[in-house]
UniProtKB/Swiss-Prot annotation:
CDD domains: GHB_like. It is found in: Secreted. One of its GO terms (molecular function) is hormone activity. SUPFAM superfamilies: Cystine-knot cytokines. Heterodimer of a common alpha chain and a unique beta chain which confers biological specificity to thyrotropin, lutropin, follitropin and gonadotropin. Belongs to the glycoprotein hormones subunit beta family. GO terms for cellular component: cytoplasm; extracellular space. This is Lutropin subunit beta. Signal peptide: none annotated. Disulfide bonds join 9-57, 23-72, 26-110, 34-88, 38-90, 93-100. Its main location: secreted.
């Protein structure tokens, strides 16, 4: 038997962007995020029953890491923290730790030109 066309929920490497409006530089960095397919079910008789929440690929275990934005003026915190996925699972979407919207065609990117070499 063949598996799903999309890979199942798991940690993957992704390039994200970090910026602060008060700092002149945006930098990109690589971290691990949770991504992939989660099986779901659709009710055949949806009439009187509440909708079944669709599971999303989300963090099971994570840690936080930080990077420093260069060139921030005095008084502006140059540190940006981000989650690093250690393990993932299919579960309910928690807005506190997950982006529950549809997938993006493009990864998060800088609004201004990223600093080269970072």
């Amino acid at each position: 038997p063949r598996g799903p066309l999309r890979p199942l929920c798991r940690p993957i490497n992704a390039t994200l962007a970090a910026q602060n409006z008060a700092c002149p530089v945006c930098i990109t960095f690589t971290t691990s995020i949770c991504a992939g397919y989660c099986p779901s079910m659709v009710r055949v008789l949806p009439a009187a029953l509440p909708p079944v929440p669709z599971p999303v690929c989300t963090y099971r275990q994570l840690r936080f890491a930080s990077i420093r934005l260069p060139g921030c003026p005095p008084g502006v915190n140059p540190m940006v923290s981000f989650p690093v996925a250690l393990s993932c699972h299919c579960g309910p979407c928690r807005l506190s730790s997950s982006d529950c919207g549809p997938g993006r065609a493009q990864p998060l990117a800088c609004n201004r030109s990223p600093r080269p070499g970072l």
